[in-house]
Amino acid sequence: MIRSPKAPTTPRLALWLWLIALVLLPTARAAEHSLYVDLGVEQQKTSWLFLVEPGLSIQTRPFALRLAAPLRFDMEDRFHLWSRDWDALSDAGRVLRELSLRVHDGAFRLFLGNLTHTTFGHGTLVQGFIASLDPDAMPLGANARLQLGPVALEAMVSDVFGPEIFGGNLSLEPVSLFGPTYDRLHLTGTFVADPTAPGDAREDGTRGDSSWVILYGVGLDWAVVRTERWQIAPYFDANFNGRGYGFHAGLLADVVFRPLKLSLRAEWRWAQAPYAPDYFDLAYAIERRDFWAAGELPISQAEAVAAIDWAHSGKVELRAESGPLSATAVLAAMGQDLFNASVVVNAVAGDFELSVFGALRHFEFGHNPDRALGLAEARYRFLDYFYTWLSAGQLYRLDESGRASALFTWSTGVGVAFLLNPPPEPNR
């Protein structure tokens, strides 16, 4: 992440956000106000941190607001405040966890917070994008969507305070423009850019020059079959990146066997470097952070794209939902026997919640990947107001010489949460 020179203003911005929320609290006609406090410990490499985080949630019909005041203290440095939490203006995302607005039955939607699993259109340019996987950085991003009859506009920026990834998507129902509503056929256009994208590393392995990366494309999909249980929709995308280009032809199928819902995607791809399918994906933030960090770099996206003879490749994605359980698995061929794979699982069983996320990047079957990432969090609620949690993350990577490095972090603690406006007890 690019560290902003305006970092000293970050604590003041956090204070102003909390003051505004406290002023709005008595006037908001909320369905639910809640307050929580977390206490815990965290380990990053050899550093031990003590966590204190109070938070406030306001839920209303038009908007939702979640604020936090996360404080981490270095247990090996006289419990001084962990400076990395407040060394950039973009760390405002630590305070404003969510500000969402929904008006006119969802015709306009706005979200401010840390962007996670963001996808545009068919996901051939922006697929599952996560703004930050750095435990010391939580940028404040924005995503907005406007629906005007048969036209839908969507825009996103990964960090409102920094020159990072931004883009937009336009979806159009062309038949509906000239007659009755027909929402089976869609035309899409997508534009995404990163003004300071990672470039090639120098010969000594250190950071090279950055450059603009601009990707754009058009797409078409048509739901040829749509019933209560089935939906089948072929699609086609044509995308461009400088001298590079790519074509995507795929099939989306949704099947409902209550309470189970399955979604399957099968996609054929043909690409010419420097274009790469799913360029802004779940691992892009890792590469970006590595690029701006000092020292030797792992294999960069730009170099990997240039080295792969893309030609023909494919992708398979499966999603399953059944009540409190959901899972998504993706396997994508990258050319030259290289693959990307990821899996996401969310489960709820009574007072217990579990979330698991894993990804392998640029791997051959039977060989180590260039990068591997695993995240997991478990949460258990007890005694009505109390809960405990355990979270852990592992990042593994290879540099150009084949040397491996790993970053492991974990945290655990307890918290208490209670309603500020509990519902009245029913009359007996």
Residue ranges and their predicted role:
Residues 49-75:
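Glycine- and aromatic-enriched membrane insertion/assembly motifs of diderm outer-membrane
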Residues 30-55:
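Short glycine/proline- and aromatic-enriched beta-strand/turn motifs that initiate or cap beta-hairpins
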Residues 110-119, 156:
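Mobile, glycine-rich extracellular loop/lid and propeptide segments
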Residues 99, 170, 406-428:
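Outer-membrane beta-barrel "beta-signal"
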Residues 1-10:
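N-terminal secretory signal peptides that target proteins for export/translocation
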Residues 65-98, 125:
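Surface-exposed loop and membrane-interface regions of Gram-negative outer-membrane beta-barrel proteins
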Residues 32-34, 47, 59, 64, ...:
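Signature for the C-terminal beta-barrel architecture of outer-membrane proteins
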Residues 14-24:
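Bacterial N-terminal signal peptides
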